[in-house]
């Protein structure tokens, strides 16, 4: 077990038991398994309150006292997930890793995620111990087994990691940092095709300290985080491995917090992953993982395990977790620093937004108009042709097709499509045919007409559009419905919610950079209105107006600085605090603004995921986002989707829709990740 560095604070959740008596513990375990049935409570209580070193002593004493193998007895007495968890705790860490890897490459198929997790996250010392343990336990060479079971660049990088030769000195050469940034840039972004060997050499061998500086410089030089380049240049398991290496270089604890969250979210629990991480990190960095988990996911690791597991299995995992954490939203001092640094980085990043639908290269509006007319003439409709044409043309090209269709046939293409198509496919195709501002105007009109208002649609559109987009929507709304958007919002909403929407609908957000002094003042207003400031400098209603004005009119770069100052000032995250302190539509619109400022593609990825998860699909939201973002940032949304939900947007759509609607959505989605 790797020990903390000299003077470093111990961050594990399991410690040496103070009055340790291995002989007595061996006897307790023997009695717990004697006779009919076993005392699982006694077993889990004892094993989770001893360190791994102490458990090895218990194993030896058990063999001396009873001539039996303790692990074999535990395997015989226990079953299922509980047995895997307890037996995992009883193995020395290197042997536990060796067993996981053996299982990952045995039988049909390979568990690449397990290989990636272990080899990307372990230190040199842990890798050397793992290689020796594998040889000892299975009388086989680990490198030979892995090379026999994997291929390509993925295999090459695994072999590099298996050497355990990452540099470990903290002295960093600025010249070498610059050279590595240049080499990575030339190997990927500047090259036709990718020089994977450079990525493998630099990411597989340089020290963590050195690589953190390389990543910072790469962002400053290229305007892209290294992760974005890896996603753009690499693919498959090799891409996943390199992203895992980067995450572990940045923060191993954050990498494991993400893995744990993904293991428990959604339907079904990935128990193997959950067990492996809880066992392997319990004496290393479980406290750090817990801090980051709460910061990122607004809930404690403890509460998620509690809600997602049951029985003795749950009790054992909770013991390894080591305790529940305070209310969501508040940062530990260390986590506040991480969040602060994240905002510093995001201020430098120039994320390149990319849509998935681009203008067709060999565009011929005349041929397209004729093909569409043919697809709708006579009996039946050729939906495939309609989808192939409309989903693969830009919006500007579709407007040309509409015009050409009218010139050729004296008919309105929209009216023909409306009469020939139906249901979800009709809504999707007609949406694609409308100019973006008119489409948004229609969605806002639909959200306000009839009984009840679709507040979610109003929020989604008004909280995320740019000034130019909002002004175009206002013009389109007036043109199409002979009424101003502001009047429509006024008559359909009320109170603070109405004021916020009308403010957003003016399209009057500042477009400059940040002002640090003003950002501190704005953060103070936010702290006062959210009732976590020590002092208050005004009455509640004027503070509410100022808070609304800050969120609705300040520029995105400035608001990022405000959120950063808010963390610095309060140790809270503004989004979590709004969720906790506010309610109803006002809370929802403020949260949407904050999320959009933080990461707009991620905001839409979350909305798409929610539109398809659980029973039933929210086709309206799914259609609206796919249509409205297809030429703006749908490629970025796809990347955020797979990063957060561990499955591609393509897979989610495929699993949740069908028929021609599915085909059209996948065409807009633009590919599998």
Swiss-Prot record:
InterPro entries: Annexin, Annexin_repeat, Annexin_repeat_CS, Annexin_sf, ANX6. One of its GO terms (molecular function) is enzyme binding. PROSITE patterns: ANNEXIN_1 (PS00223), ANNEXIN_2 (PS51897). Pfam families: Annexin. The modification N6-acetyllysine is found at residues 63, 68, 75, 81, 306, 370, 418, 483, 620. GO terms for biological process: apoptotic signaling pathway; biomineral tissue development; calcium ion import; calcium ion transmembrane transport; calcium ion transport; growth plate cartilage chondrocyte differentiation; mitochondrial calcium ion homeostasis; negative regulation of sequestering of calcium ion. The keyword Transport does not apply. The modification Phosphotyrosine is found at residues 30, 201. Belongs to the annexin family. Seems to bind one calcium ion with high affinity. This is Annexin A6.
């Amino acid at each position: 077990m790797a020990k903390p560095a000299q003077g470093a604070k111990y961050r594990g959740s399991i410690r040496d038991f103070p009055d340790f008596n291995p002989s007595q513990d061996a006897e307790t375990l023997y009695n717990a398994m004697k006779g009919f049935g076993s005392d699982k409570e006694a077993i889990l209580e004892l094993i989770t309150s001893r360190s791994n070193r102490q458990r090895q002593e218990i194993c030896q004493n058990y063999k001396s006292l009873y001539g039996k193998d303790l692990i074999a007895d535990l395997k015989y007495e226990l079953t299922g997930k509980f047995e895997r968890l307890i037996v995992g705790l009883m193995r020395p860490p290197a042997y536990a890793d060796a067993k996981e890897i053996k299982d990952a490459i045995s039988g049909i198929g390979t568990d690449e995620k397990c290989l990636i997790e272990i080899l990307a996250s372990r230190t040199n010392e842990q890798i050397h111990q793992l290689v020796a343990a594998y040889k000892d336990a299975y009388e086989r060479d680990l490198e030979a087994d892995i090379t026999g079971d994997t291929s390509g660049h993925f295999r090459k990088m695994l072999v590099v990691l298996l050497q355990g030769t990452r540099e470990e000195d903290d002295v960093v050469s600025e010249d070498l940092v610059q050279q590595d940034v240049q080499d990575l840039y030339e190997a990927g972004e500047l090259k036709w095709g990718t020089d994977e060997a450079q990525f493998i050499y630099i990411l597989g061998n340089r020290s963590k300290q050195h690589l953190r500086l390389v990543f910072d410089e790469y962002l400053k030089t290229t305007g892209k985080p290294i992760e974005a380049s890896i996603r753009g240049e690499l693919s498959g398991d090799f891409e996943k491995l390199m992203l895992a290496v980067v995450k572990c270089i940045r923060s191993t604890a954050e990498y494991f917090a993400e893995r744990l969250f993904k293991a428990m979210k959604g339907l079904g629990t990935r128990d193997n992953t959950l067990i492996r991480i809880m066992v392997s990190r319990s004496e290393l960095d479980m406290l750090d993982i817990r801090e980051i988990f709460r910061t990122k996911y607004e809930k404690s690791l403890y509460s998620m395990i509690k809600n997602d597991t049951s029985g003795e299995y749950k009790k054992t995992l909770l013991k390894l977790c080591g305790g529940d954490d305070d209310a969501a939203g508040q940062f530990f001092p260390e986590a506040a620093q991480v969040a602060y640094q994240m905002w510093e980085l995001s201020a430098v990043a120039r994320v390149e937004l990319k849509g998935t639908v681009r203008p067709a290269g060999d565009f011929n509006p005349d041929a397209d108009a004729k093909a569409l007319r043919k697809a709708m003439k006579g009996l039946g409709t050729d939906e495939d042709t309609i989808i192939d044409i409309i989903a693969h043309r830009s919006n500007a090209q579709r407007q040309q097709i509409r015009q050409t269709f009218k010139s050729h046939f004296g008919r309105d293409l929209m009216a023909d499509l409306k009469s020939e198509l139906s249901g979800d496919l009709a809504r999707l195709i007609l949406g694609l045919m409308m100019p973006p501002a008119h489409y948004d105007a229609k969605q806002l009109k639909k959200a306000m007409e009839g009984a009840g208002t679709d507040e979610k649609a109003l929020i989604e559109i008004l909280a995320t559009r740019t000034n130019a987009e909002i002004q175009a929507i206002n013009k389109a709304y007036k043109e199409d419905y002979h009424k101003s958007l502001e009047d429509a919002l006024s008559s359909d909403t009320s109170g603070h919610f109405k004021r916020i929407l009308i403010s957003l609908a003016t399209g009057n957000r500042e477009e400059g950079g940040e002002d640090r002094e003003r950002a501190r003042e704005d953060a103070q207003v936010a702290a006062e209105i959210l009732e976590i400031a020590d002092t208050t400098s005004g009455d509640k209603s004027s503070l509410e107006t100022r808070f609304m004005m800050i969120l609705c009119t300040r520029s995105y770069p400035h608001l990022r600085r405000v959120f950063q100052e808010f963390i610095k000032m309060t140790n809270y995250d503004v989004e979590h605090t709004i969720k906790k302190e506010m309610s109803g539509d006002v809370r929802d619109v403020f949260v949407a603004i904050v999320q959009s400022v933080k990461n707009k593609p991620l905001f839409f990825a979350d909305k798409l995921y929610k539109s398809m998860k659980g029973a039933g699909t929210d086709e309206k939201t799914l259609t609206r986002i796919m249509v409205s973002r297809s030429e703006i940032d749908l490629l970025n949304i796809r990347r955020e989707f797979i990063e957060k939900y561990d499955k591609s947007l393509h897979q989610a759509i495929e699993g949740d829709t069908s028929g021609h609607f599915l085909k059209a959505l996948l065409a807009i989605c633009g590919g599998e990740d």
